[in-house]
């Protein structure tokens, strides 16, 4: 039924022995599978791909600019016999002991350095060695809780250690997801072969972290019975392995956090939530060492936690693994491990390392140079912006050039023997092919200082016609089965089926970061809607009969909303220059209040909480941004696309100056180059109409497709703040220019408030200011009526305060004047001696101030958790 493709020449064949017979594990596997199972392999492959799509398993590739691609998983598992695994287990356990002892010695007595077993230059020159950690000893002396060891099988069939991963070992989540998918497809062989289970390993990891956390809880006021709070610290959605972080946190039952979610207070670490600060006792980090703490490590890190190392040194948090453990990942260390093992463990290495020569050692490098046509040159430590060193396929001329570089900077280079990795079988549409593979095995520390090796691992397979085994270069993964002769445990951390009696309304913890991103997503979306509506109206009004009279009003509205920059309109201007400035300021590269920038910022904020959005909702958001970008490229040459603003970054309507600009790329001269004959107003109007429909769809999805928790309420609070601020400012500007009672001003307000149809239905053929103000200000059922939006804002704020359970702050309703106390319609229609609507303008200013102050108070109360500033803001 299957055609067997030949293995790579000179490589160990995992499937067949030298005589061509199937090796024992594979013989058993295919016997258990049977002819029927083999005939269904193609169906299984399709099912596997469907499960990956359904589960949205992805892997971000840097070369794709952070665009996630579907996870690459091969159908057939990688099989390891019980006897062979016992040897691997002993070797990996020994390595984990050894690496932990090296880290402890380097940050402690430094005996290895003093005795010359470990060159100081190799340690102190490595960016993974962190001086702020010197002298720190974690509880129990356990620096490493998770160690990953990459193994490859040589052509002779022996296992060799290729690399260690101690900084932030990846793959634990993917290994588990691989197991869940593949074991379900091959359920009968999985049971019959008694494949060892992975769940006890993850249970051991949690038990280890919980035990380590006890030392951080000794001074807790909550009591000794309280469970420690464990958080998995991720770089965020742009990490290549972000899916794994989400999946692993959910499986382990720990909180997934980013650096912005955490804060340090009084040498303790806290998670910022809407309900207040929650103590964090253990951080299982997925960040590289240098990015963990911008105060003491990389100052440019925006993904770390300021002050984290100080909390760690104070003994109030366990960080796993300890920052600074990355130096033992250096490939040059392999050459020194045999001697170090003899000193620290009084043992020989069970698993040998790949032959390695650090180029500083002259005796070794001479031997290595003689073999450079059969070796790889690798960096001794991570260095950015360096072209990749060549491997064996580069040719002698290329190698000679690298030899000169090595002689100039010997400490930065290490030479390793090139190994021909064993070839693992893979299913390829009716055939069994083989690819080079590397096995990653994980060791988990226990509370007594021992190690538990996960019976399985994360096998990676090279891409077609590739010798390098890497997921970044198009490789794939394989589920790893360790066979056993004994019955295996059925223990699992997966949740058991829920029974009706078990159901309860579970409260979902809302982090401050998630809430803040949704808050700003609402604000950016509302800004975009307001600006699109205003721009369509302005472009349609510039050639109308009232264009000249309305021109100053339109210019001020555009300046306020950020459609043009103040510098564009500082000189005497004409409608033509105004229009050119409007068109020149559309893209996201021209300023933080442009339509393009608001769309980009909306996508960025929603992307930070991608897990809360349905697929359709997320696609709408991306389509709105991308379609508008495409339309602008057709309309005029694009000056470049900038990045989206972060939450809170940019110019807010409420409480901030919308006209402040970071650059002048959207000046009038630039607009002249973009407009003229090439500018097609009809094309732009079509694009704006299309965008308006898309934004309405996004708004509908927000109201109909999202869980209505505190974070969702904050999204709509953000929209209400922007809406009431915009509506009051528009009313004030139109009234200030004396256009409130003119037909053009009347029509302008009805369109901007999206109330034309309602007004005509209520007051057909009549244009009277009292009727207008009643609809736009007083009427509570008008979705854009000022008083109605303001009252809904007050109620939403108090709903959030009640849901968050905070008693430290005054209710928002007490800080914002009730609608009943605001001016009546009769008062709003009063005209003073200067023919101004003074009361109307005053209440617009008052409500705008309340909205701006509410935005500041929300930030202090729920996002930054600073001391309340209400007493200052609301006075």
Task: Give names to the regions the model predicted.
Residues 1-83, 87:
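N-terminal low-complexity, Ser/Thr- and acidic-residue-enriched intrinsically disordered segments
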Residues 2-24, 145-146, 153-160, 164-345, ...:
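ATP-binding N-terminal substructure of ATP-dependent carboxylate-amine bond-forming enzymes
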Residues 85-106, 119, 125-130, 244, ...:
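Active-site nucleotide/adenylate-binding loops and adjacent lid/helix of ATP-dependent enzymes
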Residues 371-374, 384-396, 400-405, 424, ...:
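Polyanion-binding catalytic cores of nucleic-acid enzymes and NTP/SAM-utilizing transferases
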